């Protein structure tokens, strides 16, 4: 079990930032690092999104709560019921590690597939039709006397 509510993902950003600090910046091509940096920024934002959405759904400012969790050490996270930063294990807000790992692996796999595919095909959304008008008021002769 790992801390739930997206807090584990937010705390994982610290490892990504450590990688950014220590990674070679050129690999022989300056453009390569620029492309990698864009990918890293996308992953960083994606890892924040579950917590941001949970906070928003609970009526809080998501970005503020993400920063609050970032400033704490694991296993602290955002408790949407109380609006406080708590020890997620003590609060009982946990999730299975395997589920989170599988979600991240599947997302990475799909991302890699999109990057290596030359063409993507998607359905064009059909315009939504207005609902039919409601029938007129009561039927003649059936009203109350």
List each model region and its residues:
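Extended, low-charge hydrophobic alpha-helical regions
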Residues: 1-145
């Amino acid at each position: 079990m790992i801390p739930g509510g997206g807090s584990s993902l937010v705390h994982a950003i610290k490892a990504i930032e450590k990688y950014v600090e220590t990674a070679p910046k050129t690999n022989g091509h300056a453009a390569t690092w620029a492309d990698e940096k864009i990918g890293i920024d996308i992953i960083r934002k994606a890892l924040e999104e579950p917590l941001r959405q949970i906070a928003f759904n609970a009526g809080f400012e998501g970005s503020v709560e993400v920063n609050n969790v970032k400033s704490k050490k694991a296993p602290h996270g955002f408790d949407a019921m109380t609006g406080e930063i708590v020890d997620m294990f003590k609060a009982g807000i946990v999730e299975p590690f395997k589920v989170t790992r599988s979600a991240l692996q599947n997302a990475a796999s799909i991302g890699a597939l999109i990057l290596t595919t030359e063409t993507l095909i998607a359905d064009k959304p059909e315009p939504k039709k207005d609902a039919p008008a409601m029938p007129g008021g009561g039927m003649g002769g059936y009203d109350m006397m």
